[in-house]
Amino acid sequence: MVAPSAEIDLAPYIDHTLLDPLATPAAIAQLCEEADRYHFATVCLAPIYVRQAVELLYRRTPRVCTVIGFPTGAHTSAVKLYEAQEAADHGATELDVVVNLGWLKAGQTEAVHQEMAEIVAATGVTVKAILETTVLSETEKRLAAEICLDAGVSFLKTSTGWRGGATVADVKLLAQVARDRIGVKASGGIRTAAQALELIHAGATRLGTSRGVDLIRNRDTLEGETNY
């Protein structure tokens, strides 16, 4: 049974997210202000806005997170590595990296492992592996999670939100693989505080949502959420 929402402070779990390609610098400034006001874990935004966010959140609690190889994961390893290193050089301390799903489905597990391990080693920051669980079989989900865990990532993340969102079942599976050694991030379609709490009780240690402020303010059903 999910505990009453008053028992858990949702704010420290939230990656306050704005990955809309139409996002403007003004919208990013608002995102950062909200994250600081509500003490969210991070702001999660496109690489182009990392420097702006780092400046705005200097000496503030929220960290700066960006996405790598987003949303398809189908960039070359060299491009992903460059993107990750540049983001870290610009001050991002968390990177959400999309796994190469084509390689995974083709059984090219060494390539998946090497790509993720190189990013972890080269940047030295928190790396979250986005597995896109909504398009994977049960076996593929577990395999992807184990590969990324072995590659040294700090979190297993369910999804980009572009192909569906987090489910309780997927969070439980990732938590089983993680076994408290690394974190689990649930992302995509998180609309209510009750849903957020259910995911936390399933094992999520971080929540990616574009509706963090509404979750904190309203704690009831939200309409019209974007899924990323």
Swiss-Prot record:
Pathway where this protein functions: Carbohydrate degradation; 2-deoxy-D-ribose 1-phosphate degradation; D-glyceraldehyde 3-phosphate and acetaldehyde from 2-deoxy-alpha-D-ribose 1-phosphate: step 2/2
Q: What GO cellular component entries does it have?
A: cytoplasm
Q: What class of enzyme is it?
A: lyase
Q: List the disulfide bonds.
A: none
Where is the catalytic site?
Answer: D96 (proton donor/acceptor), K157 (schiff-base intermediate with acetaldehyde), K185 (proton donor/acceptor)
Enzyme Commission code(s) on record: 4.1.2.4
Family annotation (Pfam families)? DeoC (PF01791)
Listed A to Z, the keywords are: Cytoplasm, Lyase, Schiff base
For biological process, the GO terms are: 2-deoxyribose 1-phosphate catabolic process; carbohydrate catabolic process; deoxyribonucleotide catabolic process
| Subcellular localization(s) per the UniProt record | Cytoplasm
Cite the InterPro entries for this sequence.
Aldolase_TIM, DeoC, DeoC/FbaB/LacD_aldolase, DeoC_typeI
Catalyzed chemical reaction(s): 2-deoxy-D-ribose 5-phosphate = D-glyceraldehyde 3-phosphate + acetaldehyde
| Domain of life of the native organism | Bacteria
State the Gene Ontology terms under molecular function: deoxyribose-phosphate aldolase activity
Residues that span the membrane, as ranges: none
Similarity annotation: Belongs to the DeoC/FbaB aldolase family. DeoC type 1 subfamily.
- What function does the entry list? Catalyzes a reversible aldol reaction between acetaldehyde and D-glyceraldehyde 3-phosphate to generate 2-deoxy-D-ribose 5-phosphate.
Q: What is this protein called?
A: Deoxyribose-phosphate aldolase
State the organism named in the record.
Cyanothece sp. (strain PCC 7425 / ATCC 29141)
